[in-house]
Amino acid sequence: MSTYTQILYQVVFSTKYRRKTLSKPGREQLFRYIWGILDSRRCKLFRINCVEDHMHIVFALHQSVALAQLVQDIKVGSSLYIKRNKLFPEFTAWQTGYGAFTYSAEARNNLIRYVMNQEAHHARKNFKKEYVRLLREQQVEFDEARLFEEE
């Protein structure tokens, strides 16, 4: 019997100390680099977007890929890529950790729209509030005092 899976993830992570370093010039190049990592692991990218202080990636995880290793490869690889290509001069690193949330196939289109509209969304709500809302929505237990590294 063949193996078939449908594991739709939204992965979210921020810049170190949530510094607003991901300016618009350079984002498309960064997105293409991350897409290349996903593609090389046979994961299907549905949408990637960011604002100045954090990144959202919506993708289908291939059954042969471990999520933690994939996210580590994305964060380490993209950090080196950003620095080597001087995409964002003020960028120092990604924050430790990430959020990974699963969704049904039926939720995919709404999730893609949500990630596409990050600029408008963050005109009203900061990343901390968005992240806490995601954790609560997904019923993830967390300690709010330990969510983010502070300077």
Regions found by a protein language model. Give the residues of each.
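Basic nucleic-acid-binding interfaces
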Residues: 1-151
